């Protein structure tokens, strides 16, 4: 049995920590199910900042030095100051330098500072893992790391827990629903989705799950486009309510402009939903155009609107894409990916 330490400065609040905390928790549980021990070191704060993450990483150095472990796995920039002498793995879920390019203002500044630390982290680590070939290429380019040093292990989903929640979620009658789930940053392309949605049949509704700095601007845009009565900003939802949104959706859409992986696509496929997304970054590695999803080019509002309308009007196509997605998502099941992760870090 191996003993691993996971280090993450990401908030345990899904509303603040995005999908990262969920993915780390699911990975921990799946590795424990294989017979190993996993300890997570994380801050107690409900919300993290660049400053708090740096202080957290400085604060845990002594604890890491004195705690027995076969490997220290630091996620993203966290673990940057881990002591040498034991296997140190940098597990990069978001290439922060890449994300920073798509943001603005203080968010961009914060990501740029964090990216400098993430670069230092991957160069100090014994092994580097990321979730997609796209992200591996970005790490190699932005952080000047040999691409051959980077292993790829995809994100994962607990299909058993998801299926139980789906089965318990009540089915609701009503108009067609387009669902998107995202932290509301510029790079998620929700403004593009709103403009495309303005062209689809008026009986459809758009339901947006997530919070973020773009929320008020997006609300204003929905009013400007004259669709505010059909657009529902739901904020952050707890797990059971989130699954219920997937269960009652007609299709899932996220025209993102940058994505290192996209756990929400796994959630949509696990819910047998057809997907409309963009042909960009890691998205084509997760979904397959014409098989599990219909893809547009990023920023192409006209094509996006056509794809949304096509799926809204074609139940047979929705069924075909949804069924294919459900079959495809099995490759990302937690036990499967946990074994890949352990093999990648070289610990048995």
Residue ranges, per PLM feature:
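Membrane-proximal helix-turn-helix segments that form the acceptor-binding/catalytic region
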Residues: 109-128, 137
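Short alpha-helical donor nucleotide-sugar binding micro-motif in glycosyltransferases
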Residues: 236-237, 244-249
């Amino acid at each position: 049995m191996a003993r691993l330490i996971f280090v993450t400065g990401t908030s345990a609040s899904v509303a603040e920590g995005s999908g990262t905390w969920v993915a780390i928790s699911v990975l921990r549980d799946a590795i424990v199910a294989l017979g190993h021990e996993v300890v997570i070191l994380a801050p107690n704060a409900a919300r993290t900042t660049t400053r708090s993450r740096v202080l957290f990483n400085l604060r845990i150095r002594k604890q890491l030095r004195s705690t027995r472990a076969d490997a220290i796995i630091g996620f993203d920039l966290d673990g940057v100051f881990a002591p040498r002498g034991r296997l140190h793995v940098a597990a990069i879920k978001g290439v922060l330098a890449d994300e920073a390019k798509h943001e603005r203002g203080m968010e961009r500044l914060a990501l740029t500072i964090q990216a400098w630390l993430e670069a230092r982290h991957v160069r100090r680590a014994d092994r580097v893992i990321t979730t997609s070939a796209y992200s591996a290429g970005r790490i190699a380019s932005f952080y000047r790391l040999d691409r051959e040093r980077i292993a790829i292990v995809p994100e994962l989903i607990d299909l058993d827990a998801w299926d139980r929640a789906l089965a318990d979620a009540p089915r609701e009658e009503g108009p067609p629903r387009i669902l998107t789930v995202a932290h509301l940053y510029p790079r998620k392309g929700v403004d593009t989705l709103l403009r495309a949605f303005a062209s689809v049949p008026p009986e459809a509704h758009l339901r947006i799950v997530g919070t973020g700095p773009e929320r008020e601007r997006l609300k204003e845009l929905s009013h400007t486009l004259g669709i505010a009565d059909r657009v529902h900003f739901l904020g952050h939802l707890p797990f059971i309510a989130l699954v219920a949104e997937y269960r009652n959706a007609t299709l899932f859409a996220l025209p993102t402009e940058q994505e290192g992986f996209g756990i929400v696509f796994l959630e949509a496929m696990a819910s047998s939903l057809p997907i409309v997304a963009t042909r960009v970054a890691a998205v084509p590695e997760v979904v397959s155009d014409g098989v599990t999803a219909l893809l547009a080019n990023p920023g192409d509002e006209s094509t996006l609107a056509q794809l949304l309308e096509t799926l809204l009007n074609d139940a047979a196509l929705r069924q075909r894409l949804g069924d294919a997605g459900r079959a495809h998502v099995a490759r990302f099941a937690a036990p499967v990916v946990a074994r890949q992760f352990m093999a990648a870090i070289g610990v048995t």
